């Protein structure tokens, strides 16, 4: 089979043998691809640094039986340095990558919309011009929409009666009317559901006008909805920093650990998840 070329986001990588790595890529035209990058752990590797997590690359691959082989790499966007320099950006970007991999589904199933959304989210997190917690929640809502899991926010998830409806139930699919409301539903302020709608629709002026309390509640609903559909918790979401007052000494220590992960090519957040 011939070589093929595609644009990709590097989701993660891990060691293989003495000098190689296996990289997991979300490509534009070929979906999820796992490939071997030979010799990238050697100091003279010509493209090792271009295969760090968070990188947006143009990559050429040779198809293999189980794993493809990376033959050429050109950097398109190098988001890693801006992301890793800040703990909050890093954890948010890690959640983006993990979500992308989970939602990509089977290998080689094209997901161009998810690829495009993931690149945009990483660019926004790295740029830092918008609150990272809002960028993450907007990404999660839109990614769930691509997967067909978007929560109902403006109509009843069960009977489609137009809203607004105050009750929200994850298993029911989002907002529910008084007639369909299951036991265990929560009743967040209407502003919380309005914020979720704004994030899903890209209404940034409305989203950025929200209060910290409403952002926190919206984040909780978004995370719960995603994890219910995934049927397991994301490793990275508990690490996401959504608090504005941070102990800078702790944050600096965490950043140093995260930089070590990226430098060594470990999966982002391994040391934090291990409690180091």
Curated annotation (Swiss-Prot):
GO terms for biological process: DNA recombination; double-strand break repair. It holds the Pfam family RecO_C. HAMAP family: RecO (MF_00201). InterPro entries: ARFGAP/RecO, DNA_rep/recomb_RecO_N, NA-bd_OB-fold, RecO, RecO_C. Keywords: DNA damage, DNA recombination, DNA repair. Involved in DNA repair and RecF pathway recombination. Gene3D superfamilies: Nucleic acid-binding proteins, Recombination protein O, C-terminal domain. The keyword DNA repair applies. This is DNA repair protein RecO. It comes from the Bacteria. Belongs to the RecO family. It comes from Mycobacterium sp. (strain KMS). GO terms for cellular component: bacterial nucleoid. The lineage of its organism: Bacteria, Bacillati, Actinomycetota, Actinomycetes, Mycobacteriales. The gene is recO.
């Amino acid at each position: 089979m011939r070589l093929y070329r595609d644009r990709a986001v590097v989701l993660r990588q891990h060691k293989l043998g003495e000098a190689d790595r296996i990289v997991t890529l979300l490509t534009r035209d070929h979906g999820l691809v796992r490939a071997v990058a030979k010799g990238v752990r050697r100091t003279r590797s010509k493209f090792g640094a271009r295969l760090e997590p968070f990188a947006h690359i143009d990559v050429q691959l040779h198809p293999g039986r189980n794993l493809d082989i990376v033959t050429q790499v050109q950097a398109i966007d190098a988001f890693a340095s801006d992301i890793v320099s800040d703990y909050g950006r890093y954890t948010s970007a890690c959640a983006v990558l993990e979500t992308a991999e989970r939602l990509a589904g089977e290998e080689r199933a094209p997901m161009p919309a998810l690829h495009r959304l993931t690149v945009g989210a990483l660019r926004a997190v790295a740029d830092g011009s918008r609150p990272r917690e809002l960028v993450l929640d907007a990404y999660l809502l839109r990614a769930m929409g691509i997967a067909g899991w978007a929560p109902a926010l403006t109509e009843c998830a069960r009977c489609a009666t137009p809203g607004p409806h105050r009750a929200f139930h994850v298993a029911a699919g989002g907002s529910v009317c008084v007639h369909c409301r299951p036991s265990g539903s929560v009743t967040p302020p209407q502003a919380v559901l309005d914020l979720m709608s704004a994030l899903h629709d890209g209404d940034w002026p409305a989203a950025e006008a929200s209060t910290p309390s409403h952002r926190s509640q919206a984040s909780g609903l978004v995370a719960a909805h995603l994890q219910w559909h995934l049927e397991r918790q994301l490793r990275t979401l508990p690490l996401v920093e959504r608090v504005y007052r941070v102990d800078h000494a702790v944050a600096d220590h965490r950043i140093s650990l995260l930089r070590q992960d990226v430098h060594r090519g470990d999966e982002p957040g391994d040391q934090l998840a291990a409690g180091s």
